[in-house]
């Protein structure tokens, strides 16, 4: 009789690298970084498609006859905007004659503003002020600030008011022989005309609600005339100019009083109108002005102030041959938490010179999607926690941290072989091992608990000579995940507080934030090293367990035909058990040799591999099996006589 020894043989050669883990080691033909570095995409995006709203003009207006060629956004995104061709928030606030007057209102946790160009130097609006840019800057800044603290906002286009009987609506030749809707100009008709008339006393009320919109705070334009000297105003002997707003307690909240404040001292015969932006609570207010003229607030924007939210402002400029201003840009840059989207090239439209710019379409294409992170540097929707460069604030969501590629730990991949147990098998994963993305995508401080690494390793596996059990390793992963969740919450709260404080001239806070993020990145990289070691050990143990199951199945199939002389080795009488018999024992004839273990079902190919040492005779088994987060893909047999 000829007896042969058949063993499951270690099949590692120089193409394999060794990976050490907690509780077990692995040989692998390949390795990969746990995460790749991601690069943010330039432009705007949102964290949640259901909780954002946009405010725009013709470039986001679906009702424009040239849509979609006239638009800088997709049809999907246009549906999210409150827009009208020719409109702007400021035009609706002041209502200059001959301009579009649109009722802007809506609700959203994230507000995207792409408007403003329709009130720019090209519009040539006068009405006692040839250059409105500084007022526009102040207006936009207040809009962004209040919008970031509110869920809903609405134009209030008709305030309740009481006007003195002696005042009647006035007009101005430099305002298309009309005047703004807000403020309204009232004048006194005095007989004889050389007399001054009486002081004006008027009242207006800011409501607590406008339609369905709650109003906790109003943005009001407090407008008044600026005279260069008393003589310019006092041609009729009417003393000093004043226009002052008082709250219900008699406190001054806005306006100008040349009875106590000096005139400009410039030379000129025509006054200029100035409008300051006031944030006022609902209530009744009074306006007192010197004889002859009264500028009366008639409109406001109301905000519910119910929750902090996100604000994105998009640069709004004309194409060639039209003069633009950059008030939107400056307003956003000076408002904490405002994200600004800017073009790098001149505006070049498709429908005409001013509508349908390709660069702007690309910058706004991200509004069609949900991002994991939005920032001044761009948006990210990949799951990696690392990026090559520091993302500039403000930033919101689960934002990646800056890291060097070589600092990211590597995990084994390709064909995997444990270094102990019943010796060997190999696996070729068809999907990502474990849910690492879900486990550590928080991008925050992580730390080792007082118990150290041992706090995660709760058990041992006696039959494999030590190490951790699969169950204890899973508990370890759960503990790491819980620790990370806790740290994620506390750290993100701290970062949000810093976001609230950051403005573009607060370099010290920027530096502090950068230091904190660097510390977060280093801590996360350290924790990933721990997870990598646990992962290697867990896979190694799982592979060893699968080998025990495989060896047990072979022994059971062999019955009395083969004698197991050591784990993974059998003696067979070649005269009693010929080749077909051996094929039955070791090749399984396409049947499943290992019980399935949920949850991962993977189609695998178990076969010999030219990388391996040992006999050229190999087992070929093709069967669907499931082994937690791993799959077997090859073993070989060593024959000895």
From Swiss-Prot:
The keyword Disulfide bond applies. Gene3D superfamilies: 2.20.70.20, 3.90.20.10. Its main location: virion. Residues 2-616 are extracellular. In natural infection, inactive HEF is matured into HEF1 and HEF2 outside the cell by one or more trypsin-like, arginine-specific endoprotease. Residues 138-296 are annotated as: N-acetyl-9-O-acetylneuraminic acid binding. GO terms for biological process: fusion of virus membrane with host endosome membrane; fusion of virus membrane with host plasma membrane; symbiont entry into host cell; virion attachment to host cell. Its EC number is 3.1.1.53. Residues 297-351 are annotated as: Esterase domain-2. Residues 352-637 are annotated as: Fusion domain-2. It is found in: Virion membrane; Host cell membrane. Disulfide bonds join 7-569, 107-152, 127-175, 196-238, 215-302, 223-275, 332-338. GO terms for molecular function: host cell surface receptor binding; sialate 4-O-acetylesterase activity; sialate 9-O-acetylesterase activity. Residues 638-641 are cytoplasmic. Glycans are attached at residues 13, 48, 131, 381. Residues 1 form the signal peptide. It is a single-pass type I membrane protein. It catalyses: N-acetyl-9-O-acetylneuraminate + H2O = N-acetylneuraminate + acetate + H(+); N-acetyl-4-O-acetylneuraminate + H2O = N-acetylneuraminate + acetate + H(+). The active site is at residues 58, 352, 355. GO terms for cellular component: host cell plasma membrane; membrane; viral envelope; virion membrane. This is Hemagglutinin-esterase-fusion glycoprotein. The gene is HE.
């Amino acid at each position: 009789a000829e007896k042969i020894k058949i063993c499951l043989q270690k099949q590692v050669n120089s193409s394999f690298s060794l990976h050490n883990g907690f509780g077990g080691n692995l040989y692998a033909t390949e390795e990969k970084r746990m995460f790749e570095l991601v690069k943010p995409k330039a432009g705007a995006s949102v964290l949640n498609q259901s909780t954002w709203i946009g405010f725009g003009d013709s470039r986001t207006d679906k009702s424009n006859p040239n849509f979609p060629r006239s638009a800088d956004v997709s049809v999907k995104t246009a549906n999210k905007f409150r827009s009208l061709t020719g409109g702007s928030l400021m035009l609706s606030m002041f209502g200059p004659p001959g301009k579009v007057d649109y009722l802007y209102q809506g609700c959203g946790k994230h507000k995207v503003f792409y408007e403003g160009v329709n009130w720019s130097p090209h519009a040539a609006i006068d009405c006692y002020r040839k250059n409105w840019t500084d007022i526009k800057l102040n207006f936009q800044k207040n809009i962004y600030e209040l919008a970031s603290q509110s869920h809903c906002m609405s134009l209030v286009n008709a305030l309740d008011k009481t006007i003195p009987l002696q005042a009647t609506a006035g007009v101005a030749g430099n305002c298309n022989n009309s005047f703004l809707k807000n403020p309204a100009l009232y004048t006194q008709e005095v007989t004889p005309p050389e007399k001054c008339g009486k002081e004006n006393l008027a009242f207006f009320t800011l409501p607590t609600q406008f339609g369905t919109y709650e109003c906790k705070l109003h943005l009001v334009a407090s407008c008044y005339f600026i005279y260069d000297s008393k003589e310019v105003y006092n041609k009729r002997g009417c003393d000093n100019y004043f226009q002052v707003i008082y709250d219900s307690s008699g406190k001054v909240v806005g306006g100008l009083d040349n009875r106590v404040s000096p005139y400009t001292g410039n030379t000129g015969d025509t006054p200029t109108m100035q409008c300051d932006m006031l944030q006022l609570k609902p209530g009744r207010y009074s306006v007192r002005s010197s004889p002859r003229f009264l500028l009366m607030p008639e409109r406001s924007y109301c905000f519910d102030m119910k929750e902090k939210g996100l604000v994105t402002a998009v640069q709004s400029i004309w194409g060639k041959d039209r003069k633009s201003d950059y008030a939107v840009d400056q307003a956003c840059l000076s408002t904490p938490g405002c994200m600004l989207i800017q073009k790098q090239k001149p505006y070049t439209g498709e429908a005409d010179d001013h509508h349908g710019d390709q660069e702007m379409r690309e910058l706004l294409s991200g509004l069609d999607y949900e991002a994991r992170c939005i920032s001044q540097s761009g948006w990210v929707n990949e799951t990696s926690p690392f990026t090559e460069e520091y993302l500039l604030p403000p930033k919101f969501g689960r934002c990646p941290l800056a890291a060097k590629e070589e600092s990211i730990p590597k995990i084994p991949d390709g064909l995997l072989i444990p270094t102990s147990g019943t010796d060997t098998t190999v696996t070729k994963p068809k999907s990502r091992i474990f849910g690492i993305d879900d486990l550590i995508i928080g991008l925050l401080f992580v730390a080792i608990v007082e118990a150290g690494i041992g706090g995660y390793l709760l058990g041992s596996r006696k039959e494999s000579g030590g190490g951790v059990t699969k169950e204890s390793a899973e508990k370890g992963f759960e503990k790491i995940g819980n620790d990370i969740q806790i740290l994620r919450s506390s750290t993100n709260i701290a970062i949000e507080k810093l976001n609230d404080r950051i403005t573009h001239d607060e370099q010290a806070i920027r530096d502090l934030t950068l230091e904190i993020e660097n510390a977060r990145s280093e801590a996360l990289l350290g924790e990933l090293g721990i997870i990598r070691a646990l992962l290697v050990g867990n896979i190694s143990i799982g592979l060893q367990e699968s080998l025990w199951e495989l060896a047990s199945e072979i022994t059971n199939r062999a019955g009395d035909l083969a004698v197991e002389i050591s784990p993974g080795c059998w003696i067979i009488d070649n005269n009693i058990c010929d080749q077909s018999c051996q094929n039955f024992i070791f090749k399984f004839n396409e049947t499943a040799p290992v019980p399935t273990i949920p949850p991962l079902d993977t189609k695998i190919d178990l076969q010999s591999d030219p990388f391996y040492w040992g006999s050229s005779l190999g087992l070929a088994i093709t069967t669907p099996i499931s082994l937690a987060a791993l799959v077997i893909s090859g073993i070989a047999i060593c024959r000895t006589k």
